[in-house]
Amino acid sequence: MIVGIGNDLVEIQRLTNMLNKGHGQRFLERCFTQQEQQLCNGRSTPQRACCYAKRFAAKEAVIKALGVGFRQGLWFTDIEVLPNQLGRPTVTLHGATAQWLACHHPGQVNIHLSLSDEKGLAIATALIECHPLAMAPS
């Protein structure tokens, strides 16, 4: 069963500006996990903002796919976007976001994610599917 589909578009220059301002570190700590920060900070200067922009777009896309928005105690850092061994972007949910999904959609959940960038824009599309737990025989 499809839980939802979400997408988001982020202007990379906007993230560059945020990172270069005095509150850039606070923004990173509020929106990205330590592992995400390590990944993006390891990139060259031009690619650093793009890395963050893709992950920010991905987090927004996942929240849109959940259909709840950032409320009910859900945080950006509850959604972690990292590459797997082959470089494919994967989503791991933590905290209240993971609890909300498990409560409202029990079963095996798969989050499919696509990230891209072109001409100063980063885009993410997320599709969340849930295979409900089999009902126990009566």
Curated annotation (Swiss-Prot):
It catalyses: apo-[ACP] + CoA = holo-[ACP] + adenosine 3',5'-bisphosphate + H(+). It comes from the Bacteria. Mg(2+) binds at residues 8, 60. InterPro entries: 4-PPantetheinyl_Trfase_dom (IPR008278), 4-PPantetheinyl_Trfase_dom_sf (IPR037143), ACPS (IPR002582), Ppantetheine-prot_Trfase_dom (IPR004568). The keyword Lipid biosynthesis applies. GO terms for biological process: fatty acid biosynthetic process. Keywords: Cytoplasm, Fatty acid biosynthesis, Fatty acid metabolism, Lipid biosynthesis, Lipid metabolism, Magnesium, Metal-binding, Transferase. One of its GO terms (molecular function) is holo-[acyl-carrier-protein] synthase activity. Belongs to the P-Pant transferase superfamily. AcpS family. This is Holo-[acyl-carrier-protein] synthase. It comes from Magnetococcus marinus (strain ATCC BAA-1437 / JCM 17883 / MC-1). The gene is acpS.
